[in-house]
Amino acid sequence: NKTSADATVTNGNSCYSLAGATYNVYQGPNATGTPIATFTTDANGHAELPKPLANGVYSVKEIKAPKGYKLDEKVYTFSIDGRDANLDVQDDPGTLALQVIKKDSNSGQTPQGNASLAGAVYQVSYQQNGQTIVREGTTDELGRVLPAFTRIPFGVITVQEIKAPEGYKLDPSIHTYTISPNNPGVTDFYELEPEDLTEEVIRGGVAIEKRDAVTGKTPQGDASFAGIKFDIV
């Protein structure tokens, strides 16, 4: 009988299934040599050997984890002495460490002017154990939320900026990601694409009025203010 090692992560989440775990059975206690039998769990995590075993000591090892779970490397031993043997095992569910990194929409990780990538507050939401979990994190000067958001179940995750850093506009978008154990390249650590979380710097205009030093306003004689160029540095 197989169960989840952390049901709060897997309960009600279709990204996890107890079906499809495959085990090899070996003669002796060390799970070595040629397997004498193989069995696969059903949706309830239950499996039975296809035929009875003779009395003796046997070992079992998982060779394929079910969807959403980590492979269990442990070797389990049991003995047959004329009675049925029951074996209870658990698999650890896979989870994500979510790294949020923000960038300037034009310059990348270099803030413009007096703006700063530090101080942006992000809200991460996801479903776990029948509840909506909401967590918050604040960016550092490189635009990173540290530490990363850890122990997030596979599934739908939303990320939203709720406070912009100094000198930048608030990003009102709700960014939604669906991350499953079947996504190519998904490991325990998942970094959100920085291009999704860019900041637009707040810009202001400049008005210049040139005046005559003597009259205080209009030019003298045939002089003219027209065509004068200014450099803004």
Provide a role label for each language-model segment.
Residues 1-233:
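Solvent-exposed loop/turn and edge beta-strand elements of beta-rich ligand-binding domains
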